[in-house]
């Protein structure tokens, strides 16, 4: 009954009585009024905040304002609501406009509603106001309950009013205005007795004539109902419910608490309420059993109509999509005209579940109770996501009936079945941040956030930094879940994701404006890493899968687990969440529809698979192809070896088949790349072609020798990827099912990269040979030839490119030239792959006869499997420098071989190409024989030596060189030089012989091949080869550890025999051989060696130095400068604590003599190059000698992976081995030439050859040799250079000041030409030129050529690969420190290492000149520009003027005048091979 005001009531009654309206028109009018009700006005915040009142002055029959409850404690089922004593008389304050009037006494009740309405009309006062009251109790009434029913009780003036407390009324003398009671029920009230309560309520008695006190009493009485008392004088003696005597109520009107329904729960007792009757007492409709008055009947009909409309509303479908509020926004925060009308507003939970039927009409069956999963969604009106989940849960039975296999996702709730606390969206203008329910101000308008939101909208992968202002977190969560399941380095990315420049700026912005103002580092933020959204989004959505990235990131952040343990936890999380992320149906198949309905992370692939159930989607096929590639090339299990019979060896594939498969993989990679470029229109648009995403090989090169099937599977998978990419290009525009997204293309690129990096050693890191064997390229090369040859070459190409048919040649040879044998047939054919053609036009195809044993590359002669192993291992080496040392078939010298023209050409090798000359050999001289190549077996057929190839089945195709035929041999008649190397004797090697001594157990470096270990030189030949004054006697045993070195020495014995009975000629000690043997003169005694530094020199770099050929008398070629690869120059610069640039003295191109490393040798440091003679033997000899003496050798390896020699030294894990990268790019002047402020800074870390590595080595050295002098690896005194200065063409720098004065000053003694004297002494030259002292005053102070020391910045492993200076995030104070710092030359000073993440805690060191020595500023010339460095004044402490820096420190640092080096913090030593001293249990050198 809308708008029931006091002045309107008599008019309404008179209108009804005068027109004699029936019941039906009134019902229709009430129904229309019910369906067209309006929205409530805004709540009274003043009264509502007191938790005492509900809605103030709200019209009747309107829903209450929904306010979320503060999660009240659940009431025990069936328990009674507890009532607060203070709430018994709670009331509402009067309106401010109400006039002050004394309370009037309550008259007797009127006999009926009509009389009551007339009495209201006759006794209304003009000053009377009205008031909305509501009671609040812990158990029953809560003013903030979102599900409240308007229980409107209209009373007349003068009726019994509750006595309000003094705190309830603003004014003390205000009269009690007219009461309008609105009871609010708590969501935590008991629902177990709902049906019983409804039955006890009878036929829907109206609540308009009942007071809140009877509601409370009836609520406590279970099924009790208060009967209407008879109209007698005894009614005046009924005590009040509060226990206090109240005014008697006379007359024959019903009491103020008659027939109160349970839905009116206020928890307040009003005076004058009669005591509740027993539950069994009937409730007559009228005292005395008569009919109700006409007014009461009308009210009952209206109440029934209202409840019937509520029942219809519950059966209506969900509102249209347009009425729903947008995600993350409450509908009650919308403007009033845009708020959706809630059909359930104003109804209690009992009425929602069980609507009442219309009384005295057709009885309707009560609606079935709503599902339990949807109850919390109806209560949580502010969560649109929860409402959507509830709607899905409510429609679960219907969906299950039509699709029984559909996976039903249930939201994750609390154990009590309630939504998680804090699930409500944050208030307007705020976003989630911090603990449960906390939020912060939104920063949507900040430029950094705007740019980040645009990047997030376009990103396909998870963004490395996420903030709530960027948009909906669903996309980020799904991408993170995908990444956790698919990425190999998921935890590393979550903890330390690589940030670009923009993401780095965003991360700094978040740290400065979001995290820093809100607490310390352990402050609760709701997400443990930058990429993770707030956990509140997952809690609000009830999505358990979204907790997976949080769990993975939490484990990744923990320091309590190592890498292996974290990997186990990650795998456990993947298995635990697998069924949730990839649901399966009852048959165990992946249920794509369930993935769509449950978790949208797999929605795209599932939708495609549903559209094409007969064939997997392209994205699925891409993933399967990538999986097959990884499985085919991954580490092979030992099951095949275990299945073989005992005592038998598994058959190994031939070298020809391995080359065929390697070329097939190269062509497959090329085909995929071409398809990708055509699809995306360029390489820059292809995802995954990033240097940072290059994967590591799937298996070591040696594993490919026994896995030909894996190579074939990988090639076939790549061709399948090529087909998928082509379909996407041709059909993707018209058919969306063939399209490939960025994730699929990235996976395809990664599959190609995995194959390429794994197969690269097999093709010797060169794809030209495979390209020449492509059929289309062969024909193209033929048609583009010159006119005179185009016809013949095209015909030859067509004949050569005939389809290969192995079945036609069962006993002869294959199209590639390899004999077809049973083993080849067992290996399988390549008919499923595109054909590989043997050669290019213009070359004769090889036709090798059955006597193919003449070719050592493709046969198994005598040695059997050993020869095949040697060939296989040779084909899979990773050293590009040793390509020229590979053994290739050469021109046969026997008459039988010369009779066949095919044997005289290079094409005797199957599958050879025009590129083979560049790969396998060098241009030959007139004799047609390279000096470093061994003799062929045919040339030794008539030899009478004891090591002939036919004697013991020796295969000369081993990885070591035999003595080649000299160009000029002065040989006596009948003399034939023996072969230096032969097979290993059956009885075992002699201890004085030459062979490899490979230690037992595990090694830091790859173990040599079986063929290298099988090479042997007899002791009598060893003694003759090493007996030369070129080799110091103490180091001669090292030569016996290296058969390769012995073969090289034998190849240089080209002179006449040194004495009678000698088997070899006299050794010709040429310049290159002397340079390769110079290392033996560094340390005379091998016992004094404690540290070995391994490096790979650049071209023409060696320790002998010498004048370059550009100078008069020079014979040495000028070395090549490289900005990327470091050689001997970079090694000495790091050991000498100086910066390497192309113009500095440290570069080998500026040397005029040999560098002096005697200071390092005095400490026991041996510098060993991969090009030195017996490099492998020296390392293994030192390891064996020191290990036998129970000493550990400290090995520092600066050799890159691609430069590691073939069959390099095996270093046992008993010794200490440290590896680091050597590159000139550590100097900021080389890496970023334009950054002038960093020209004297050098980057360092534990992975770079520099102070970071040296600190680890010095600590290990101190543990190994506690009684020795400490190791000093980064000192200026370690290295001295021989360069051209004004003191001479070959001046050793730094030249001491005393020696400088002795050599330079006498030339100008008595010179009258002051200009010549100034120019000769360099008075006006810069003090330092390219870091070295140049002017006279600088040379007179520190020495000529003394260099400035750099400032080392500890950048960590990630900073070592920085491309731009901004990626290092250098603090401004540190950058200024590097600009003004000038570390004067000091031969014994330690390196100055500063952390790159902190501001320096000391003043920048300067150079100060005493008066009388010229200008106080120091001039430094670098890269053609001169810089003036001002000294540090003594009178100013903080700011010294231009060029200085203001330092802000917490603790006072050293005094400005003290030039002392910063003490470096202790660096953690992370050496895998470190062991306790004196432990011999793992020493492989002790028998």
UniProtKB/Swiss-Prot annotation:
<comment type="similarity">
    <text>Belongs to the herpesviridae ICP4 family.</text>
</comment>
<feature type="compositionally biased region" description="Basic and acidic residues">
    <location>
        <begin position="988"/>
        <end position="1007"/>
    </location>
</feature>
<keyword id="KW-0244">Early protein</keyword>
<feature type="compositionally biased region" description="Low complexity">
    <location>
        <begin position="235"/>
        <end position="272"/>
    </location>
</feature>
<feature type="compositionally biased region" description="Pro residues">
    <location>
        <begin position="273"/>
        <end position="285"/>
    </location>
</feature>
<feature type="region of interest" description="Disordered">
    <location>
        <begin position="803"/>
        <end position="1007"/>
    </location>
</feature>
<feature type="compositionally biased region" description="Acidic residues">
    <location>
        <begin position="214"/>
        <end position="224"/>
    </location>
</feature>
<feature type="compositionally biased region" description="Low complexity">
    <location>
        <begin position="201"/>
        <end position="213"/>
    </location>
</feature>
<dbReference type="GO" id="GO:0045893">
    <property type="term" value="P:positive regulation of DNA-templated transcription"/>
</dbReference>
<feature type="compositionally biased region" description="Basic residues">
    <location>
        <begin position="920"/>
        <end position="929"/>
    </location>
</feature>
<keyword id="KW-0238">DNA-binding</keyword>
<dbReference type="InterPro" id="IPR005206">
    <property type="entry name" value="Herpes_ICP4_N"/>
</dbReference>
<feature type="compositionally biased region" description="Low complexity">
    <location>
        <begin position="807"/>
        <end position="829"/>
    </location>
</feature>
<keyword id="KW-1048">Host nucleus</keyword>
<dbReference type="Pfam" id="PF03584">
    <property type="entry name" value="Herpes_ICP4_N"/>
</dbReference>
<feature type="compositionally biased region" description="Low complexity">
    <location>
        <begin position="165"/>
        <end position="193"/>
    </location>
</feature>
<feature type="compositionally biased region" description="Low complexity">
    <location>
        <begin position="938"/>
        <end position="951"/>
    </location>
</feature>
<comment type="function">
    <text>This IE protein is a multifunctional protein capable of migrating to the nucleus, binding to DNA, trans-activating other viral genes, and autoregulating its own synthesis.</text>
</comment>
<keyword id="KW-0804">Transcription</keyword>
<keyword id="KW-0597">Phosphoprotein</keyword>
<keyword id="KW-0805">Transcription regulation</keyword>
<dbReference type="GO" id="GO:0003677">
    <property type="term" value="F:DNA binding"/>
</dbReference>
<dbReference type="InterPro" id="IPR005205">
    <property type="entry name" value="Herpes_ICP4_C"/>
</dbReference>
<feature type="region of interest" description="Disordered">
    <location>
        <begin position="310"/>
        <end position="370"/>
    </location>
</feature>
<feature type="compositionally biased region" description="Pro residues">
    <location>
        <begin position="66"/>
        <end position="75"/>
    </location>
</feature>
<dbReference type="GO" id="GO:0042025">
    <property type="term" value="C:host cell nucleus"/>
</dbReference>
<dbReference type="GO" id="GO:0039695">
    <property type="term" value="P:DNA-templated viral transcription"/>
</dbReference>
<feature type="region of interest" description="Disordered">
    <location>
        <begin position="41"/>
        <end position="295"/>
    </location>
</feature>
<feature type="compositionally biased region" description="Low complexity">
    <location>
        <begin position="849"/>
        <end position="860"/>
    </location>
</feature>
<feature type="compositionally biased region" description="Polar residues">
    <location>
        <begin position="878"/>
        <end position="893"/>
    </location>
</feature>
<dbReference type="Pfam" id="PF03585">
    <property type="entry name" value="Herpes_ICP4_C"/>
</dbReference>
<feature type="compositionally biased region" description="Low complexity">
    <location>
        <begin position="867"/>
        <end position="877"/>
    </location>
</feature>
<protein>
    <recommendedName>
        <fullName>Major viral transcription factor</fullName>
    </recommendedName>
</protein>
């Amino acid at each position: 009954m809308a708008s029931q005001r006091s002045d309107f009531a008599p008019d309404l009654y008179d209108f009804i009585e005068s027109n004699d309206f029936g019941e039906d028109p009134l019902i229709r009018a009430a129904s229309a009024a019910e369906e067209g009700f309006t929205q409530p006005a805004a709540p009274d915040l003043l009264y509502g905040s007191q938790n005492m009142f509900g809605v103030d002055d709200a019209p009747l029959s309107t829903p209450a304002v929904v306010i979320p409850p503060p999660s009240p404690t659940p009431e025990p089922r069936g328990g009674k609501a507890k009532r607060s004593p203070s709430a018994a008389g709670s009331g509402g304050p009067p309106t401010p406009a109400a006039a002050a009037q004394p309370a009037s006494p309550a008259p007797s009740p009127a006999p009926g509603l009509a009389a009551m309405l007339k009495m209201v009309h006759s006794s209304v006062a003009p000053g009377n106001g009205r008031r909305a009251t509501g009671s609040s109790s812990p158990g029953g009434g809560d003013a903030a309950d979102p599900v409240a029913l308007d229980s409107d009780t209209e009373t007349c003036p003068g009726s019994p009013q509750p006595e309000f407390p003094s705190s309830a009324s603003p004014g003390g003398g205000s009269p009690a205005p007219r009461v309008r009671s609105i009871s609010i029920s708590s969501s935590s009230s008991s629902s177990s007795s709902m049906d019983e309560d409804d039955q006890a309520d009878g036929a829907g008695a109206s609540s308009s004539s009942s007071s809140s006190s009877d509601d409370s009493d009836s609520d406590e009485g279970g099924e009790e109902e208060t009967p209407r008392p008879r109209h007698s004088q005894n009614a005046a003696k009924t005590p009040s419910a509060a226990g206090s005597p109240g005014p008697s109520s006379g007359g024959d009107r019903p009491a103020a608490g008659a027939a109160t329904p349970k839905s009116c729960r206020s928890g307040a007792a009003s005076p004058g309420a009669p005591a509740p009757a027993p539950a069994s007492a009937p409730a007559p409709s009228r005292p005395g059993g008569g009919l109700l008055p006409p007014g009461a009947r009308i009210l009952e009909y209206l109440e029934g109509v209202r409840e019937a409309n509520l029942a219809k509303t519950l059966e209506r479908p969900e509102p249209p999509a347009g009425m729903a509020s947008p995600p993350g926004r409450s509908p009650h925060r919308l403007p009033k005209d845009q708020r959706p009308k809630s059909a359930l507003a104003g109804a209690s939970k009992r009425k929602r579940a069980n609507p009442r039927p219309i009384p005295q009409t057709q009885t309707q069956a009560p609606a079935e109770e709503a599902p339990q999963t949807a109850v919390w969604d109806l209560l949580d009106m502010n969560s649109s996501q929860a409402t959507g989940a509830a709607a899905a849960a409510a429609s679960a039975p219907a969906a299950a009936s039509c699709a029984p296999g559909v996976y039903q996702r249930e939201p994750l709730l609390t154990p009590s079945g309630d939504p998680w606390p804090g699930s409500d969206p944050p208030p307007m203008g705020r976003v989630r941040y911090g603990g449960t329910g906390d939020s912060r101000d939104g920063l949507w308008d900040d430029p950094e956030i705007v740019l980040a939101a645009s990047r997030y909208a376009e990103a396909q992968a998870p963004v490395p930094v996420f903030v709530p202002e960027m948009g909906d977190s669903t996309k980020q969560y799904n991408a993170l879940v995908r990444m956790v399941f698919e990425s190999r380095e998921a935890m590393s990315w979550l903890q330390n994701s690589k940030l670009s420049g923009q993401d780095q700026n965003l991360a700094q912005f978040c740290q400065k404006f979001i995290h820093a103002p809100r607490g310390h580092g352990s402050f609760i933020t709701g997400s443990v890493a930058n990429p993770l959204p707030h956990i509140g989004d997952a809690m609000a959505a009830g999505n358990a899968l979204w907790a997976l990235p949080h769990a993975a990131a939490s484990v990744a952040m923990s320091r309590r687990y190592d890498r292996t343990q974290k990997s186990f936890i990650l795998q456990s999380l993947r298995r635990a969440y697998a069924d949730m992320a990839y649901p399966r149906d009852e048959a165990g198949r992946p249920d794509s529809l369930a993935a769509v309905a449950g978790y949208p992370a797999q929605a795209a692939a599932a939708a495609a698979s549903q559209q094409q159930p007969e064939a997997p989607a392209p994205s699925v096929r891409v993933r399967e192809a990538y999986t097959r590639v990884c499985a085919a090339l991954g580490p092979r299990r030992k099951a095949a070896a275990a299945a073989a019979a005992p005592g038998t060896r598994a058959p190994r594939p031939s070298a020809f088949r391995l080359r065929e498969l390697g070329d097939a993989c190269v062509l497959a990679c090329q085909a995929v790349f071409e398809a990708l470029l055509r699809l995306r229109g360029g390489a820059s648009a292809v995802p995954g072609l990033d240097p940072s995403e290059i994967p590591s090989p799937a298996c070591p090169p040696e594993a490919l020798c026994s896995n030909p099937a894996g190579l074939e599977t990988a090639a076939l998978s790549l061709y399948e990827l090529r087909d998928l990419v082509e379909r996407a290009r041709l059909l993707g525009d018209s058919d969306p099912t063939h399209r490939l997204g960025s994730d699929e293309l990235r996976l395809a690129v990664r599959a190609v990269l995995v194959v390429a990096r794994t197969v690269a050693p097999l093709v010797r890191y060169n794809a030209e040979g495979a390209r020449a064997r492509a059929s289309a390229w062969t024909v193209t090369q033929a048609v583009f030839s010159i006119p005179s040859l185009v016809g013949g070459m095209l015909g030859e190409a067509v004949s050569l490119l005939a389809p290969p048919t192995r079945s036609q040649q069962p006993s002869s040879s294959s199209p590639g030239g390899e004999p077809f044998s049973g083993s080849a047939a067992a290996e399988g054919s390549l008919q499923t792959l595109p054909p590989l053609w043997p050669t290019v036009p213009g070359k004769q195809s090889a036709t090798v006869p059955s006597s193919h044993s003449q070719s050592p590359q493709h046969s198994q002669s005598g040695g059997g499997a050993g020869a095949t192993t040697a060939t296989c291992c040779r084909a899979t080496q990773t050293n590009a420098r040793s390509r020229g040392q590979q053994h290739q078939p050469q021109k046969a010298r026997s008459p039988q071989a010369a009779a066949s023209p095919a044997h005289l050409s290079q094409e005797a090798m199957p599958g050879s190409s025009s590129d083979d000359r560049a790969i396998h050999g060098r241009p030959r001289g007139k004799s047609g024989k390279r000096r470093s190549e061994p003799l062929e077996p045919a040339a030794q057929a008539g030899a009478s030596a004891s090591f002939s190839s036919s004697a013991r089945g020796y295969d000369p195709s081993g990885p070591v060189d035999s003595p080649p035929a000299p160009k000029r041999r002065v040989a006596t008649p009948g003399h034939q030089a023996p072969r230096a190397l032969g097979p290993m004797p059956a009885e075992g090697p002699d201890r004085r012989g030459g062979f490899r001594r490979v230690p037992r157990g595990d090694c830091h470096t790859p173990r040599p091949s079986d063929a290298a270990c099988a090479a042997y030189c007899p002791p009598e030949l060893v003694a003759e080869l090493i007996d030369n004054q070129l080799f110091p006697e103490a180091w001669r045993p090292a030569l016996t550890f290296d058969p390769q070195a012995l073969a090289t020495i034998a190849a240089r014995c080209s002179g006449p025999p040194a004495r009678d009975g000698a088997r070899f000629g006299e050794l010709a000690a040429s310049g290159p051989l002397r340079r390769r043997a110079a290392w033996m003169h560094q340390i005379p005694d091998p016992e004094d060696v404690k540290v070995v530094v391994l490096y790979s020199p650049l071209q023409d770099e060696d320790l002998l130095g010498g004048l370059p050929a550009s100078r008069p008398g020079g014979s040495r070629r000028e070395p090549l400068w490289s900005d990327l690869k470091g050689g001997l120059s970079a090694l000495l610069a790091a050991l000498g604590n100086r910066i390497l640039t192309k113009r500095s003295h440290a570069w080998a191109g500026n040397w005029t003599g040999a560098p002096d490393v005697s200071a390092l040798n005095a400490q026991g440091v041996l510098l060993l190059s991969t090009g030195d003679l017996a490099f492998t033997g020296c390392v293994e000899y030192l390891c064996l000698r020191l290990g036998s003496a129970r000493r550990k050798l400290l090995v520092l390896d600066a050799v890159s992976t691609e430069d590691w020699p073939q069959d390099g030294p095996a270093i046992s894990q008993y010794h200490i081995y440290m590896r680091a990268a050597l590159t000139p790019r550590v100097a900021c002047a080389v890496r970023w030439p334009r950054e002038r402020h960093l020209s004297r800074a050098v980057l360092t870390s534990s992975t770079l050859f520099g102070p970071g590595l040296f600190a680890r080595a010095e600590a290990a050295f101190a543990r190994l040799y506690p009684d020795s002098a400490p190791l000093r690896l980064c000192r200026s005194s370690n290295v001295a250079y021989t360069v051209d200065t004004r003191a001479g063409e070959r001046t050793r720098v730094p030249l001491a000041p005393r020696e400088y004065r002795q050599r330079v000053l006498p030339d100008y003694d008595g010179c009258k030409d002051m200009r010549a004297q100034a120019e000769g002494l360099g008075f006006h030259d810069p003090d330092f030129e390219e870091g070295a002292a140049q002017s006279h005053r600088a040379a007179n102070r520190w020495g000529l050529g003394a260099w400035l020391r750099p400032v080392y910045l500890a950048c960590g492993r990630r900073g070592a690969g920085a491309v731009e200076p901004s990626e290092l995030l250098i603090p401004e104070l540190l950058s200024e420190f590097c600009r003004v710092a000038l570390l004067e030359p000091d031969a014994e000073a330690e390196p100055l290492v500063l952390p790159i993440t902190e501001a320096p805690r000391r003043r920048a060191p300067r150079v100060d000149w005493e008066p009388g020595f010229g200008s106080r500023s120091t001039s430094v010339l670098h890269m053609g520009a001169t810089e003036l460095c001002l000294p540090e004044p003594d009178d100013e402490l903080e700011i010294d003027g231009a060029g200085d820096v203001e330092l802000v420190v917490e603790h006072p640092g050293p005094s400005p005048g003290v030039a002392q080096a910063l003490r470096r913090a202790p660096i953690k030593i992370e050496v895998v091979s470190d062991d306790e001293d004196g432990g011999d249990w793992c020493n492989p050198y002790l028998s």
